[in-house]
């Protein structure tokens, strides 16, 4: 368990502006990783190996994209007990994102609203940081997902060019690549979830992936991250499109633009994506509908509203194969990672993924 109980540090962090606290933590993790300071947040990884999309994961609990946008803290995050970490979202060129303030806590709801807008240092810096990871260089069992998007200045008609540029850049470093087409904080980005736009984008991705697989001698799985604000008909069309283009999995879900559950709370009317406890039910519903549309064997990573071990289990029962945490980490601390992984392991064969025997 972590040597520094999160309950002691959370009041200090919550006394800061939400984004300032985020930046402080990222900076501390980046500076402290690979030093004795890392013991302050180190957890033992729960040994619950599974295989999905041709990849072996140490356990089913991962970190969602958005926390480590520039891949600065992979080694530190890997020490928290995650089975996989997803870094990004990265865009081809560096961009500042939307004006501040742009991240807000809703403590009563155990939620966050953000409208960051893919603020990141760009693809070149992202790849440089990936190359500095000792875990990656040492062949760690930790799986690494790299989440890619488009620059705000790129016209939607040319969006595929940004995704292709990022795919090309991150491909040698990724265990899987995630296409973020569902952030509500880049204007019109969610139109890429429409049938025709998605068909065009995924066709281009599939073609480029085939070229890269031949060049690098390995086929990197591609996942698509979707919104919770889609109806069943939209999900059915999307499922068919994903399968038609040989996409390897779906990440369900991103943040929501719906505010019904948090009406009346401070910051509830701020624009942006809502994450945390209020998203759990909607996310689980989308997971269930996707599982029905995609069938038993199609990989689903469930994310949205995991604030406890029981919430993580609910994602698996809804139809997810793996789960990801982000806002829960902010409210509950690193101990949630191990708690969730242990609870899922205790399910035994109840989840949709077959557990593999431990390797000595």
UniProtKB/Swiss-Prot annotation:
Cofactor mode of binding and number, as noted: Binds 1 FMN per subunit.
UniProt xrefs under InterPro entries: Aldolase_TIM, DHO_dehydrogenase, Dihydroorotate_DH_2, Dihydroorotate_DH_cat, Dihydroorotate_DH_CS
GO terms for cellular component: cytoplasm; plasma membrane
GO molecular function: dihydroorotate dehydrogenase (quinone) activity
Catalytic activity from the UniProt record: (S)-dihydroorotate + a quinone = orotate + a quinol
Pathway in which this enzyme or protein is active: Pyrimidine metabolism; UMP biosynthesis via de novo pathway; orotate from (S)-dihydroorotate (quinone route): step 1/1
Keywords, in A-Z order: Cell membrane, Flavoprotein, FMN, Membrane, Oxidoreductase, Pyrimidine biosynthesis
Lineage: superkingdom: Bacteria
Places the protein is found: Cell membrane
Main location: membrane
Keyword Cytoplasm among UniProt keywords: no
Active site positions, chain numbering: 183
CDD domains (UniProt xref): DHOD_2_like
Gene Ontology annotations of biological process type: 'de novo' pyrimidine nucleobase biosynthetic process; 'de novo' UMP biosynthetic process
Residues that bind FMN: 65-69, 89, 147, 180, 225, 253, 276, 305, 326-327
Residues annotated to bind substrate: 69, 114-118, 180, 185, 254-255
Function summary: Catalyzes the conversion of dihydroorotate to orotate with quinone as electron acceptor.
Quaternary context: Monomer.
Entry-linked NCBIfam families: PRK05286.1-1, PRK05286.1-2, PRK05286.1-4, PRK05286.2-5, pyrD_sub2
Similarity annotation: Belongs to the dihydroorotate dehydrogenase family. Type 2 subfamily.
Protein known as: Dihydroorotate dehydrogenase (quinone)
Organism: Verminephrobacter eiseniae (strain EF01-2)
Name of the coding gene: pyrD
């Amino acid at each position: 368990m972590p040597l520094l109980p999160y309950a002691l540090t959370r009041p200090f962090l919550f006394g800061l502006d939400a984004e300032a606290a985020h930046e402080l933590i990222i900076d501390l993790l980046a500076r402290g990783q690979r030093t004795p300071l890392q013991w302050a947040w180190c957890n033992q990884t729960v040994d619950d190996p599974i295989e999905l999309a041709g990849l072996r994961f140490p356990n089913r609990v991962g970190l969602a994209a958005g926390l480590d946008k520039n891949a600065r803290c992979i080694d530190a995050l890997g020490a928290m007990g995650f089975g996989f970490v997803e870094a990004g979202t990265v865009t081809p060129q560096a961009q500042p994102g939307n004006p501040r303030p742009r991240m807000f806590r809703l403590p009563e709801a155990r939620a966050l609203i953000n409208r960051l807008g893919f603020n990141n240092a760009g693809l070149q810096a992202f790849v440089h940081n990936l190359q500095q990871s000792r875990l990656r260089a040492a062949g760690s069992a930790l799986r690494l997902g790299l989440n890619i998007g488009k620059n705000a200045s790129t016209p939607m008609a040319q969006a595929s060019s940004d995704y292709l540029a990022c795919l090309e850049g991150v491909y040698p470093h990724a265990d899987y690549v995630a296409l973020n087409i569902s952030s509500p904080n880049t204007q019109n980005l969610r139109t890429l979830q429409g049938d025709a736009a998605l068909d065009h984008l995924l066709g281009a991705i599939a073609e480029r992936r085939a070229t890269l697989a031949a060049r690098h001698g390995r086929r990197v799985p591609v996942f698509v991250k979707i919104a919770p604000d889609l109806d069943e008909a939209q999900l059915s069309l999307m499922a068919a499109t994903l399968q038609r283009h040989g996409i390897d999995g779906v990440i369900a879900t991103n943040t929501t633009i719906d505010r019904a559950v948090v009406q009346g709370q401070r910051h509830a009317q701020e624009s942006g994506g809502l994450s945390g406890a209020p998203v759990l039910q909607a996310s689980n519903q989308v997971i269930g509908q996707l599982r029905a549309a995609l069938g038993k064997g199609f990989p689903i990573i469930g994310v949205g509203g995991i604030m406890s071990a029981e919430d993580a289990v609910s994602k698996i029962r809804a139809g997810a194969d793996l789960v990801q945490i982000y806002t829960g980490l902010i409210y509950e601390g690193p101990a949630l990672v191990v708690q969730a992984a242990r609870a899922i392991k205790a399910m035994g064969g109840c989840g949709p993924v077959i557990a593999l025997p431990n390797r000595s």
